[in-house]
Amino acid sequence: VDHLLDARHNGKTRFRFSINSRYVINHFEPGTSSFDGRLAAARKVAGAGYKLGFVVAPIYRHEGWERGYFELFQELARQLEGMDLSDLTFELIQHRFTKPAKRVIEQRYPKTRLDLDETKRKYKWGRYGIGKYVYRDEEAKELEDTMRRYIEQFFPGAYVQYFT
């Protein structure tokens, strides 16, 4: 992001960063920037006066997920302390998968810890004629309520654009 820090954005440009719990980044996002690297970039752009947004995705239920996401928002708040967060946004996207994606993941990562058990999910028709597996309604509601509660606790002025 360094080459964008001195651009004349006139306060009209928003940087959106994908963030997740350390567990999800470490186990399911190989080859991506670390949690700390993402936060360092977010601090830089916020310091340059850009609006900030965070896409929490995919929100994944795993053992200890509540603690992991609490720590995510706690550390995010600590790292962004003193920054102008007056127009901070969050987008919340639960883990989902399609049958074709499941096949690819299982072929490329045969030892994955990613739970792709279709019997534990709800089938939802997608916009483009292909269905996807999402968490069941009660699990999705628990995810959404938990994320919104953490955001309200650590970023009371932030706007959650959506949960899907």
How does the language model describe each region?
Residues M83, E91-T164:
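C-terminal accessory extensions appended to soluble enzyme cores
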Residues V1-E118:
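Conserved AdoMet/S-adenosylmethionine-binding subsite of the radical SAM
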